[in-house]
Amino acid sequence: MAPARGRFLLTLHSHLPLVLGHGRWPHGSDWLCEVTAGCYLPLLEVFERLAADGRRDLATLTLSPVLCEQLAHPSYRPEVETFLEGRLRSARENRGQFEAAGEDALAALTRVWEAEYGRLLARFRALDGDVLGAFRRLAAAGVVELITSAATHGYLPLLGREESVDLQLRLGAASHARHFGAAPRGAWLPECGYRPRYEWSPPAGPLRGKVRRRRRGIEEHLARLGLRYFVTDAHLLRGGEPYSAYRDYYPALRTVAAGADQPAYQRDRTPYRPYLVASRGGEGAAAVFTRDPRTTLQVWSRELGYPGDGRYLEFHKKHAPGGIRYWRVT
C-alpha cells in the first residue's frame, strides 16, 4: 500500500445572529428557516447516507452557540413548518402566474420547487424538528466532529477586556456541552480572528494611548478551557495581505483597508500542516489549522468561485410574492 500523501480536513462553520423574535422578513426567522431548508437538512441527508455506508470521520462542524440556542428554541419548529408550507403554496401560485404569462420554463421550475419543499417538510417532521439532535447523533456515532465558537460570535481580538474573551469562549463551550452532551475539543474563532499575548492600549476613547497592559493570547484562553485547536486564515500564518471578496467593489472598504496595501512581512510557512501556537511568556498552547486559500477563493470569489458560476442559483434574486429563487447566476 502506498504511503498516505496527506490528510484533508473538511471544516464547515455555521453561524446566524439572533433572529427569532425579530419578525420574519427580511432579517427575522425567515433567515433561519431558509438556511434550515437550504443547508442543514440537505447536509444531514448527505451525512446520514454516507454513515449508512459505513463512513466515519467525514467532517468537522461548528454550530455557533447563538445558532444552537435558536435551533433548540420552542418556536423554531413551528416557524420552519410555517415557512415550508408557505413555500409550497407559493410554488403552486407561481405556477399559475407563469402559465398565464406564457413562461413555460419558469412554470416547470415551480414543480421542481414544490417537490423539493414537500420533501424537506416531510424530512423535518420525521426529525420532529430536532435538527440539533440529528447532528448530535452523527457526532456520537463518529460520523462528524462538532466544535464550538464564541458565545455571541464576538470578534475576540478587539474585545477590550480579558473577562469578555474568557466569557465568550467559556459560555460557548458550556452551550456546546449542554446541547451535544460532550465537551468540545476545538473552536472556530469568529472571522478566524486571533491575536497573541502582547502589550495592549485602548484603540479609542479618553484612555487611548495612555495606558498599557499585558493581554493574554487567544490560545491561552482556549487552553484554560481544554480547547485544543482552532482554525485561522493563511495571512495570519504567513503574513501578507488578507483576501477580501468585497473590497474592490466598495470604496468605503478600500478606505478602511488602506493600510493593507502597504508591504507586509511574509514568512515561509505552508498552510497545509498544523502548528502549535504559544505566546512568549504565556501559559498554555493550542494547535492551529489554516484555511486553504484556494478553497477560500472557490467559496467567496465571484470571479473564481461559486458566487459567479452560472450553474448555481442567484442568491439575491427572488420571485415576489413567495420568495422562491428561479434564476441562475448571470
Segment roles from a protein language model:
Residues T62-L67, A150, G186-G193, H235-L236:
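Short, solvent-exposed turn/loop segments enriched in Gly/Ser/Thr/Pro and often Arg
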Residues G38, P42, S164-L167, L171, ...:
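Generic recognition of stable, solvent-exposed alpha-helical segments in well-folded globular domains
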Residues G6-L9, R56-T60, V144-I147, A173, ...:
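Beta-sheet entry/capping signal
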Residues V165-G193, S279:
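CE4/NodB-like, metal-dependent polysaccharide N-deacetylase domain
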Residues P3-A107, F124-F135, L158, E162, ...:
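Trp/Phe/Arg-rich N-terminal binding region typifying the photolyase-homology
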Residues P3-R7, L12-L16, R87-G160, V165, ...:
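Active-site cores of enzymes that catalyze phosphoryl transfer or operate on phosphate-rich substrates
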Residues L20-G23, Q70-S75, P157-R161, C192-E220, ...:
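A short acidic (Asp/Glu
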Residues V46, L50, Q168-S175, H179, ...:
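Generic, well-ordered alpha-helical scaffold segments in large soluble proteins
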